[in-house]
Amino acid sequence: MSPLGSAGVLAPHLTRSTSAEEQFEMKLKQGHRVFGVDMRIVNDDEEPQPHDGKTRGHLVVRGPWIISSYYNNHDANDKAFTKEGWFYTGDIATLDENNILQLVDRSKDVIKSGGEWISSIDLENEAVGIPGVVEAAVIGVAHEKWGERPVLILVPQDSDNPPSEDSVRDFLGTRIAKWWMPDLIVFKDEIPHGATGKILKAELREEFRDCLLYTSPSPRD
């Protein structure tokens, strides 16, 4: 069982009615809820989203062992709970028709661009496949029209001969939606990590805090 209260063991009816390949795909996900934990995904307006395995939303949970409030801290409660008392886990997720959970990003890392969500994790997973790249990180940076746009930060295998920006865009162009394409591609010698090896995106966001992207052609021209 995961800390979220989900289990990866498939129910008997699913093992009987699905192929081995489908079962493998299900087991790659975080699993279905366990007894005593309710899960749903909601949009920014706290509206429940469909369990279709595709629609992404904020994962919220409730149950007898789930925190119901912070003691004497109204500001924290307003941020951590929906109006109906569901607790925000801080994850972006999907739920399918069998109520199997899949985590796709952290709420603080997802990029909200023109009313649509871009998963930083999905974009990073594609970017690390670029020939000559050893590590990738994606953050959202302010944009004068779209609110946020993705910035792709790459660590090249050879810092003296990094991939060209055109080759990066050509590689990603066949693998991601057009509107997911990063507005800015930056090469760095290294990306900051914490003690556990996790990328410190807060440091990257601080580094690009004063960056403001514009729609091309730039209004500054």
Predicted segment positions?
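AMP-binding/adenylate-forming catalytic core of the ANL superfamily
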Residues: 63, 68-69, 78, 92-180, ...
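Conserved small/polar residues in nucleotide/adenosyl-binding loops
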Residues: 214-221
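Flexible lysine-rich "adenylation lid" loop at the C-terminal edge of ANL adenylation domains
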Residues: 46, 188-208
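Conserved AMP-binding/adenylate-forming
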Residues: 2-100, 107-110, 123-124, 130
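Hydrophobic/anchoring residues in structured secondary elements
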Residues: 138, 186-187
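Generic C-terminal helix-cap and adjacent flexible tail
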Residues: 209-213
